[in-house]
Amino acid sequence: AELVDEEPLRTKAVRLIDQLMQHVVDNDFYLVDYDGEPTTWGKWNPEYVNARPKMVGDRKLNSSNIIAMLQTAYHFTGKDIYKEKAFELMHEHGYLDNLMRPMEEIGKAPDTADEWSKMLSESWDHSDDEMYYMGYWGLYRYAFNDTLKAKYRKAIIDHWEYERPEKEGLWNVFTSMVSNEFDLDEAIWFLQEHPLDLI
């Protein structure tokens, strides 16, 4: 929305952000489908998120994404409810701790965990990395204050260092948002060598 020069289109984009985020807030941090049930992946409610053991990546991912979404909605709408809910999740429900958890601590759920947590942590899912990184824009750029921005920077760099061997262009480009120390040559290599038939 901030890159759109045409006012009607910008207004429409901001309205969509607002409507989606208000829906999630109104539905206790669930994205509810036409049947009245939460979608499979649209679950940011503390009861759901914190039911995952600390080492299960979805606990970190869902915390990071919802804070990014709330910050983005606040940035574009100025509605206090989004800021209030973000701080509530961070301070009353541990979402800041969740999203700051180092990547080296993320792994398989213990044998005592519920079946859903075990399934979520059976293997590393590349699409989860994409969800993290796409959310990092709103997490970092629209941070409510410099203290949070510094923490988010640390979390993003920690994630990048974990993913660095992949030489993924997207990870490097997004990391350049928070640090001058990223692999520009690797990003160029990835973009030049990535098979076009996979697009």
Residue ranges and their predicted role:
Residues Q22-S64, Q71-I199:
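Ser/Thr/Asn(+Pro)-rich, low-complexity disordered segments
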Residues L3-D35:
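A surface/extracellular/periplasmic glyco- and lipid-processing/surface-interacting theme
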